[in-house]
Amino acid sequence: MEKMAMKMLVIFVLGMNHWTCTGFPVYDYDPASLKEALSASVAKVNSQSLSPYLFRAFRSSVKRVNALDEDSLTMDLEFRIQETTCRRESEADPATCDFQRGYHVPVAVCRSTVRMSAEQVQNVWVRCHWSSSSGSSSSEEMFFGDILGSSTSRNSYLLGLTPDRSRGEPLYEPSREMRRNFPLGNRRYSNPWPRARVNPGFE
């Protein structure tokens, strides 16, 4: 009797472990959709950057996938970007361009939310900040109105990147209502970074 009870207990525990370890994916997305979403995110950055060079992504990952309906979803991506040797006017595919080399070439960390329908990109929101490991922590980049510029003379450009956050702090896209309350200009934005004026990000 005791052996039977012990056997039932073992089966119960193993069964509980099985159900807690297995899970249901939020959405069984096609890898091609991920590639399309990443390409659209990089294209959004390059379309709003004032750098003379194109940016290219690397170290990308999917953070979340939400199914909106049978044919629509949103993807939250995180990736890093760096300037390439291709100039903007070349209209080249950034994925085919070589990265610029050198210790002082900065790296930016970006998060994007991409809405897709019928495997086609509908909307893209991207927000980036300079990586603390890239050596781009100058005070000029902490002011509102700085836009993603070139690594050699980016202070001559308006940089659209927010000041760097701590690695463990999440990065969120402000809502439209928040941006209405804090219009473009020299007004300070209430945030955890002292003396920093924050850009609402790429949109």
UniProtKB/Swiss-Prot annotation:
InterPro entries membership: Cystatin_sf (IPR046350), Spp-24 (IPR010892)
Disulfide bonds, paired cysteine numbers: 86-97, 110-128
Compartments it resides in: Secreted
Chief place of localization: secreted
Top-rank taxon, per record: Eukaryota
Similarity comment text for this entry: Belongs to the SPP2 family.
Function: Could coordinate an aspect of bone turnover.
Protein name (Swiss-Prot/TrEMBL): Secreted phosphoprotein 24
Gene name tied to this protein: SPP2
